């Protein structure tokens, strides 16, 4: 327990904070509640950022219906790596990060090999609202995979640090 406290203190001394502190001290304090529906939707947020001239990972496509899942190959084209996210997910739930593809299979960043059927199931789960903030129907965003600089490896866990 003492080791955990020392680690937390060392990170805090370097200006690194946990997500709960970030939310309490910054997100809740400096953001209007009326704007939450905009920022809670990754697609709307991305579109607004682009319109404002802010650089964001390239959006390859959006899937809004079960029928559109058929367009996955068209959306990802020849790309070997990409990310699928629920538009209104939270805390990283529902995000599928593909690091490579070969012979009709896909490798996730954790090294798991999956098939097209598993990607389609993930998309269907996203659309059904399994990962959305309110449990309602959602959209799936397919975008460029950001790979963090190795400097963040020791302070981040499962994902790209904010």
State each model region's role.
Residues 1-18:
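Conserved oxyanion/phosphate-binding beta-strand-loop segments in alpha/beta enzyme cores
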């Amino acid at each position: 327990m003492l080791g955990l406290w020392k680690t937390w203190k060392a990170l805090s001394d370097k200006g690194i904070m946990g997500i709960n502190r970030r939310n309490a001290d910054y997100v809740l304090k400096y953001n209007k509640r009326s704007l939450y529906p905009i920022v809670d939707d990754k697609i709307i947020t991305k579109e607004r950022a682009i319109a404002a001239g802010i650089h964001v990972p390239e959006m390859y496509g959006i899937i809004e219906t079960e029928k559109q899942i058929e367009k996955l190959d068209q959306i990802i084209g020849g790309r070997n790596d990409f990310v699928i996210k629920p538009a209104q997910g939270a805390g990283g739930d529902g995000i599928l990060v593909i690091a490579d593809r070969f012979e009709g299979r896909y490798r996730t960043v954790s090294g798991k090999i999956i098939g097209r059927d598993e990607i389609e199931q993930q998309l269907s789960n996203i659309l059904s609202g399994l990962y959305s903030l309110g449990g309602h129907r959602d959209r799936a965003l397919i975008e460029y995979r950001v790979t963090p600089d190795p400097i963040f490896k020791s302070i981040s866990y499962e994902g790209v640090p904010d």
